[in-house]
Each structure stands twice: as C-alpha cells, then as structure tokens.
C-alpha cells in the first residue's frame, strides 16, 4: 500500500491528523489525541530505523494527574519505538510546568499561536451586533450566559448527542441571530459585524475563536477558565468576569461604550503569537544542529507554516498531497 493511499484511508473526512514540519530530519506535528488514535496507521508509513521527532498540541486542559498518564503512555511507546522523540506544545504556563516537572520535553506554545493572522483583518463595516459567540453547542460553552445581551450573533453547530442542549439554548436565546456554519476564510467578516467577542466556557483548550476575535480587532469578554485562552489576554482589551449573565452583559456594554483600539488589539495579539512561535523555532533549530542539518529552520518556517499547522483543517486531498506532503522522499511505506 502506498503512502498516499494509506494516508487517504484515515483522512476520509478530509481532516488532517498530522503535518510535516521537516523532512530531514523528520519532524511531525499532531494533536496528542489524534496521534494516539492514529498511531497504528502512522506506523505503516513512517520509518522505524531513523530518529523521528513529534511535536504535540495538547488540546484540552491537562491537569497534573493527566500529565502523569501521558508520561506513562510515552514510556510505553518508547519501549517499542526507541527512536521516537516527543515534545509537547502547551496552551498555558501552568500546563507547561506540569510537563516539565514530569520530565517531559515541553514548551509553552499555545495552539492559537499557529492561527494564520493573514486570514483575519479589521474591516470598516457597520456593527450590527453587540456581541458574537463562535462556539459549538456543547454544555461546556454555557451559551445561557449571553442571555442579557440585546443584539447577539451565535455561530455554531452541534452533534447528535448535543441536540437537547442546542434546543434549550435556542429557547433561552430566542432573540439571537443564528448561523450554523461559516467557512473559516469568511469568519472574520462576521466578527467585524460585532463589537465584542464572547468566551464563556470554564474548561476546555485554548479556544481558537478567542484569538480569532482578537486578530479581527475585537475586545473580548471572558469568564475565568482553564485551558490557555487567557495567554493572549491583556487588561486593555479583555474583561474577565464572573459567570453571571448580567455581569457578562455589563462588561460587553462597557467595552462598547469605551472601545479599545482595534489595531492595538490585533498588533498585541500577533506580538504574543510571534513570541511563542519563536519558542518552537528555537527547539527545532537545536534539533537541526544536532542532526547536522545544513539549513536554518527560521528560514524554513516561512515555507512550512500553514494555518493551524494544517491540523484538523478541512482541505481537499489533492491540495493536501501537493502542499502538505510536499512529495516527501523521506516518508516511504515500509516494505
């Protein structure tokens, strides 16, 4: 079976599960959950006789206990694949401390760091909504906390087992404007129609939408949370408030009354992103040097960088093959 057909088999839904950062030395990135799910299939197409580096985004918040479970899993994999090398890219400094305490290779590089800022812009358009909430209809998102906002835009879908939560949320927020789904390249258009972005969960990952608001120049009202979205928050343009619908609404209208500068919000967000990207670049630069690679990853970065590092991004397979795989000579199926 060829590499392409093997990958195509587990990318049937056109969801990317890994991305190549470097072919020589071979460096892959993936979400930790996706790596575990697809390890058996990855084994068929990645070489077993040379060192390989994996950089994992950790997804949802990882407690110290969960980090110990990850450490045990890594030890198990190392027994079978001693040439595999693992790095974890953490969404918060707290989580990074847990990983380092456990003796695992890790850096503080929030997955929102790898949003392509060029997909988002500040637009001079009329503000139709007081706030926008880009969030799937799932219990953790706590849509009901937006019930006291007068002009509200909600964008999000739901899974079959979330239908009850969806129906109850729609009943509570029957005044809101709803859109089930918007293509990612157009999401900034809708964000620019709102004054404020909402982030109302208390526990998840870094929440891409939170940073997408900021890159579109929107201030944010957030509740206290675990998961790392606050890595991009600054008091000048974010209000973190208690999970009470009246308090949330008050914060929204205060930001509307005294709006922060949109260009400043975007510029500060990109500054934070670039700082965290540099952490990844520095680590891979060190790998290059130890491998005797006569290249500079800082230069390679501009060539390999893609929105969200290509992870869980819906891209037609022909584009995946030509742009993401780059006709790799390293990734050959085992004979």
Could you tell me what each predicted segment is?
Residues 32, 38-139:
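Catalytic core of nucleotide-activated saccharide and alditol-phosphate transferases
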Residues 243, 256-319:
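A charged, aromatic-enriched C-terminal amphipathic alpha-helix characteristic of glycosyltransferases
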Residues 138-141, 199-210, 224-225, 229-232:
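Nucleotide-sugar-dependent
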Residues 114-188:
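Conserved catalytic-core segment of nucleotide-activated headgroup transferases in glycan assembly
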Residues 183-194, 215:
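Short acidic alpha-helix that forms the nucleotide-activated donor recognition element
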Residues 234-246, 254-259:
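Conserved acidic donor-binding segment of nucleotide-sugar-dependent glycosyltransferases
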Residues 192-205, 218:
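Acidic donor-binding loop of glycosyltransferase active sites
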Residues 219-223:
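Short hydrophobic beta-strand element within catalytic cores of glycosyltransferases
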């Amino acid at each position: 079976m060829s590499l392409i057909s093997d990958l195509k088999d587990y990318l049937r839904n056109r969801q990317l599960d890994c991305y190549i950062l470097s072919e020589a030395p071979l460096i892959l990135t993936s979400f930790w959950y996706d790596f575990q799910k697809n390890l058996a299939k990855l084994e068929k197409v990645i070489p077993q006789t040379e060192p390989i580096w994996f950089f994992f985004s950790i997804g949802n918040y990882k407690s110290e206990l969960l980090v110990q479970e990850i450490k045990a899993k890594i030890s198990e994999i190392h027994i079978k694949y001693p040439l595999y090398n693992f790095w974890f890219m953490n969404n918060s400094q707290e989580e990074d401390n847990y990983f380092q305490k456990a003796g695992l290779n890790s850096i503080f590089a929030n997955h929102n760091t790898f949003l392509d800022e060029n997909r988002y812009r500040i637009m001079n358009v009329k503000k139709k909504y007081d706030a926008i909430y880009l969030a799937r209809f799932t219990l953790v998102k706590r849509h009901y906390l937006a019930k006291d906002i007068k002009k509200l835009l909600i964008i999000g879908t739901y899974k079959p087992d979330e239908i009850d939560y969806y129906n109850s949320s729609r009943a509570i927020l029957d005044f809101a404007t709803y859109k089930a789904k918007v293509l990612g390249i157009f999401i900034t258009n809708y964000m620019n129609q709102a004054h404020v972005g909402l982030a109302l969960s208390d526990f998840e990952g870094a929440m891409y939408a939170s940073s997408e608001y900021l890159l579109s120049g929107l201030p944010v009202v957030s509740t206290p949370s675990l998961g790392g979205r606050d890595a991009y928050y600054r008091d000048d343009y974010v209000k973190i408030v208690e999970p009470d619908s009246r308090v949330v609404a008050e914060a929204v209208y205060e930001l509307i009354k005294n709006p922060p500068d949109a260009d400043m919000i975007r510029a500060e967000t990109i500054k934070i992103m670039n700082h965290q990207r540099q952490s990844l670049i520095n680590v891979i630069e060190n790998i290059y040097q130890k491998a005797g690679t006569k290249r500079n990853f800082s230069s390679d970065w501009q060539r390999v960088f893609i929105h969200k590092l290509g992870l869980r991004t819906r891209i037609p397979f022909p584009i995946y093959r030509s742009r993401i795989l780059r006709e790799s000579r390293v990734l050959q199926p085992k004979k």
